[in-house]
Amino acid sequence: MTEYLLLLIGTVLVNNFVLVKFLGLCPFMGVSKKLESAIGMGLATTFVLTLASVCSYLIETYILAPLGIEYLRTMSFILVIAVVVQFTEMVVHKTSPTLYRVLGIFLPLITTNCAVLGVALLNVTENHNFIESIIYGFGAAVGFSLVLILFSAMRERIAAADVPLPFKGASIAMITAGLMSLAFMGFTGLVKL
């Protein structure tokens, strides 16, 4: 039980996929302008990442490895992610049309979010079992959502601040992301996996 908790904390804080592994930067920069869309994107990504981790583990364990076709891993994981994203898009469209409109193009772009594919591939590479795969996927998603929500809240405050002209827009966003990454480096050594 303790190692599962350490895996979760390590994935959320110490080995954050956005700030440490630099995966998922496109939605991190693209959806973080408004807090509402960041929260929605975080929830959708959490659902997709967790479900994609489970599905990719099952496909790897029960189809690819027994048949000796591990070379199809990346292609099959991309297909699984696309199916999970389509399912998520249908669920969001039915349950919350407003959120569906707010997320716009970013919801289908979860398919190309490298963090989702990265989590699926790292689950296999690190030989996680079924429970560890779920925790790893959920932890990566929570870490992504945490960073996305914090960053969007900071960007909203920065938008209201008097920023010098050369730093407006993407420049101040990159500086802010760098400072967040430095802050998360403070968690290094908290959990050794």
Curated annotation (Swiss-Prot):
GO biological process, one term: electron transport chain
Keyword Ribosomal protein in annotation: no
Major enzyme class: translocase
Transmembrane segments: 5-25, 39-59, 63-83, 102-122, 134-154, 171-191
Any one cellular-component term (Gene Ontology): plasma membrane
Membrane-protein topology: Multi-pass membrane protein
Localization (cell): Cell inner membrane
Keyword Chloroplast: no
UniProt-listed Pfam families: Rnf-Nqr (PF02508)
Alphabetized UniProt keyword annotations: Cell inner membrane, Cell membrane, Electron transport, Membrane, Translocase, Transmembrane, Transmembrane helix, Transport
Family classification: Belongs to the NqrDE/RnfAE family.
Function field: Part of a membrane-bound complex that couples electron transfer with translocation of ions across the membrane.
PANTHER family membership: INTEGRAL MEMBRANE PROTEIN OF SOXR-REDUCING COMPLEX, ION-TRANSLOCATING OXIDOREDUCTASE COMPLEX SUBUNIT A
Quaternary structure and interacting proteins, as annotated: The complex is composed of six subunits: RnfA, RnfB, RnfC, RnfD, RnfE and RnfG.
Protein name: Ion-translocating oxidoreductase complex subunit A
Gene name per UniProt: rnfA
